[in-house]
């Protein structure tokens, strides 16, 4: 787990960079056995705000390399995010997540919902190669074991390339 004492020792309330007007934002991957605990994320975001750092993203580690050792299923990552953000102040709620950088753009896992009698992931584009899709909500086939972009899109606003 994250050693917040080490972070606190290495940090000052405001570093010289911040005093010069630089804005610092944080992003971190959610990783099994390291920070896959809502209390860790909650504490992390609160500590960052105390240090003048803006929480930015909780992201899903890419589907490469050692991902098999550290992966967290999308449905669990979304529950961790929701639970962690629920008891923070508005200053911490700038953190988005969980998100993934896929071929068409950055996708946020919003939740799970029944769509036409089928369970589906509710996803939203945070960034996208096609500006028209930014902020659009769409659905993808639900798989409780999914650790990366769902491959089969059920519905979206207009034509949409397959996630990969």
Label for each model-derived stretch:
Residues 49-164:
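Auxiliary Fe-S-binding modules of radical SAM enzymes
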Residues 1-88:
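Conserved AdoMet/S-adenosylmethionine-binding subsite of the radical SAM
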